[in-house]
């Protein structure tokens, strides 16, 4: 007779079965993705609003602090990537002087694994991208939807790639890049680069990676949060999307600073084929380091993803060697930071959160300077030959803090107006101006750069109406008058307007200005116009004056349920 087989107690079997889901599988693999986007030349630490650092204990970001955190994570975790989603170029005196050499130098020191091209990488033309950056970096720069043609094709061949396969901890990870197809309207890429639709261009490159047996694929790019989500939904085979361009702040839990989250981090998109795809951005200006943990199964499917942007505040020390290197590069910039142009006794709000959504006093200052620069007194019938100014909110890049004794330097202005354009004089019909103001708000709320700041103009919008029918009132300051007053815009009348050369060329989608302008005279450099005005005024205090207004319907539409609730509350009170 055979002995009975030994059986485990039922309680032990139950306990083991409960632990099985927690037991690590040999096939799963975890990747840490550190990421930045829209740094915009913030190599030094800045104040909390990304202006010049005034109190070191309250300052954030900078490459020396970023280096410390990146090195710490690399030492603590086995499988790590450091990625950048574009727009390292443009934003402070650093780029004005060094023109991209500083970007290549410090990104190499940080050891980036890959970067996507942003629209601002083309601000100095293709040559301003090739020589300072593409030929000097030690990591791949990516974009799958930019195609070179003509004489540029052989010149730029191999300097940027559609994708790159990286080896990380014994696994292979594919990184595929993309860039906003609107770049020709936003920057200066020239005519020999074609910017294709992102989704259409990405799919065949992802398919190529799949044929190479790469089953973990990150889309890294610079087209904005809406496009990031669309790529996650539509491009088969993309596992993670790391984006930029819209300075989107995502966070799970209580945010550590003043940025308001646009959603949880990571933001999960369900793809058309049923996968859960994490999408991330890390705000802008080097204030945060994006930190995403992704677990893949043996087939390359995302099992879990979690993390949060890390606020790079003063609790993280600045690396001494990188800081010393920054100080050496800084010497060449000192002349720009010591010359005082004038003083402000109010905060000059040039933030994207303000100037791309409503009237901002920095926009008012710039427009007032532009009109002042064009003061001419042709005869006794006219107090001036031009009274109107428009400036795209996306061209205003930084605030100026009045708490540094109110001092305004050339360096401060270079952060506000970093593009080096001119303020030009044009003649336009009233009908063209009406089209321009409809364009200003046709996609209002997306933090896009076409929202217009004004001078000599009063405009009222109703955002509850459909796009291209949102301007409900448009008045302009008369010029042929002894006492200037605001008069309704006349569609067939020809008006003079001062505006950035960028808009003259159709930038930010203002094609109607380029196509319909009747006369154009080039003006003075933008930063010179504003600096001379500040020097003349000595002390400035621009206000928000009601130049741009939104009708009551715009506000009521979003609050309709609250209005109904309030109505019934009043009825109940009356009849109690």
Swiss-Prot record:
Propeptide: 552-576
Glycosylated residues (UniProt): 55, 313, 335, 349, 405
Site (Transition state stabilizer): 120, 123
Tissue specificity statement from the Swiss-Prot or TrEMBL entry: Expressed in the brain.
Names of required cofactors: Zn(2+)
CDD domains tied to this protein: MPP_CD73_N
Binding site for Zn(2+) 2: 38, 87, 119, 222, 245
E.C. number: 3.1.3.35, 3.1.3.5, 3.1.3.89, 3.1.3.91
Catalyzed reactions per annotation: a ribonucleoside 5'-phosphate + H2O = a ribonucleoside + phosphate; a 2'-deoxyribonucleoside 5'-phosphate + H2O = a 2'-deoxyribonucleoside + phosphate; dTMP + H2O = thymidine + phosphate; CMP + H2O = cytidine + phosphate
A Pfam entry, by short name: Metallophos
Signal peptide as annotated in the record: 1-28
Record membrane topology: Lipid-anchor; GPI-anchor
Disulfide bonds: 53-59, 355-360, 367-389, 478-481
Enzyme class: hydrolase
GO cellular component: cell surface; external side of plasma membrane; membrane; plasma membrane; synaptic membrane
Binding-site list for AMP: 356, 392, 397, 419, 502, 508
Transmembrane segments: none
Gene3D superfamilies membership: 3.60.21.10, 5'-Nucleotidase, C-terminal domain
Cell compartment(s), UniProt: Cell membrane
Domain of life: Eukaryota
GO biological process, one term: negative regulation of inflammatory response
Main location: membrane
Subunit structure of this chain's protein: Homodimer.
The name this protein goes by in its record: 5'-nucleotidase
Annotated source species: Rattus norvegicus
């Amino acid at each position: 007779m055979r002995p009975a087989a030994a059986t485990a107690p039922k309680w032990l079997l139950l306990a083991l079965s409960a632990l099985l889901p927690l037991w690590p599988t040999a096939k799963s693999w975890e990747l840490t993705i550190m990421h930045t986007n829209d740094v915009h030349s913030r190599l030094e630490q800045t104040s909390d609003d990304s202006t010049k650092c005034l109190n070191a204990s309250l300052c954030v970001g900078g490459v020396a602090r970023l280096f410390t955190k990146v090195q710490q994570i690399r030492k603590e975790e086995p499988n790590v990537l450091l990625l950048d989603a574009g727009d390292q170029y443009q934003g402070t005196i650093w780029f004005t002087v060094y023109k991209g050499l500083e970007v290549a130098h410090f990104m190499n020191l940080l050891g980036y694994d890959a970067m996507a091209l942003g629209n601002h990488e083309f601000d100095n033309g293709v040559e301003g991208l090739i020589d300072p950056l593409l030929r000097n970096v030690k990591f791949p720069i990516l974009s799958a939807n930019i195609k070179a043609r003509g004489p540029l094709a052989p010149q730029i061949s191999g300097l940027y790639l559609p994708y790159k396969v990286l080896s990380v901890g014994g696994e292979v990870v594919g990184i595929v890049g993309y860039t906003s197809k609107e770049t020709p309207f936003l920057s200066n890429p020239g005519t020999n680069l074609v910017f294709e639709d992102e989704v259409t261009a990405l799919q065949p490159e992802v398919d190529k990676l799949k044929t190479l047996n790469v089953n973990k694929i990150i889309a890294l790019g610079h087209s904005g949060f809406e496009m990031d989500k669309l790529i996650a939904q539509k491009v088969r085979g993309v596992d993670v999307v790391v984006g930029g361009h819209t300075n989107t702040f995502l966070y799970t839990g209580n945010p550590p600073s003043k940025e308001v989250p646009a959603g949880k981090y990571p933001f999960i998109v369900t793809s058309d084929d049923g996968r859960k795809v994490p999408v991330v951005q890390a705000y802008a200006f080097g204030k945060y380091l994006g930190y995403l943990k992704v677990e893949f199964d043996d087939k390359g499917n995302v099992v879990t993803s979690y993390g949060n942007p890390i606020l790079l505040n003063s609790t993280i020390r600045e690396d001494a060697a990188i800081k010393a290197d920054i100080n050496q590069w800084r010497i060449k910039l000192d002349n720009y930071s010591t010359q005082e142009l004038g003083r402000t006794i109010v905060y000059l709000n040039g933030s994207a959160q303000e100037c791309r959504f409503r009237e901002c006093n920095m926009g008012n200052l710039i427009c007032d300077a532009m009109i002042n620069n064009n003061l001419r007194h042709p005869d006794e019938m006219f107090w001036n030959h031009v009274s109107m100014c428009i400036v795209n909110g996306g061209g205003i890049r930084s605030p100026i803090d009045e708490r540094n004794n109110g001092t305004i330097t050339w360096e401060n202005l270079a952060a506000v107006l970093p593009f080096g354009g001119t303020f030009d004089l044009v003649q336009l019909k009233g009908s063209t101006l009406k089209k321009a103001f409809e364009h200003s708000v046709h996609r209002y709320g997306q933090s896009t750069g076409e929202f217009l700041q004004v001078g000599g103009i009063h405009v009222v919008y109703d955002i509850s109406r459909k796009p291209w029918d949102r301007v409900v009132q448009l008045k302009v300051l008369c010029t042929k008058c002894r006492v200037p007053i605001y008069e309704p815009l006349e569609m067939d009348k020809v008006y003079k307007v001062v505006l950035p050369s960028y808009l003259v060329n159709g930038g930010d989608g203002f094609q109607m200005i380029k196509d319909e302008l009747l006369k154009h005279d080039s003006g003075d450099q933008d930063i010179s116009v504003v600096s001379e005005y500040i020097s003349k005024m000595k002390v400035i205090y621009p206000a928000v004056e009601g130049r741009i207004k939104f009708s009551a319907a715009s506000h009521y539409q979003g609050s309709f349920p609250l209005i109904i609730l309030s109505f019934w509350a009043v009825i109940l009170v009356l009849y109690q």
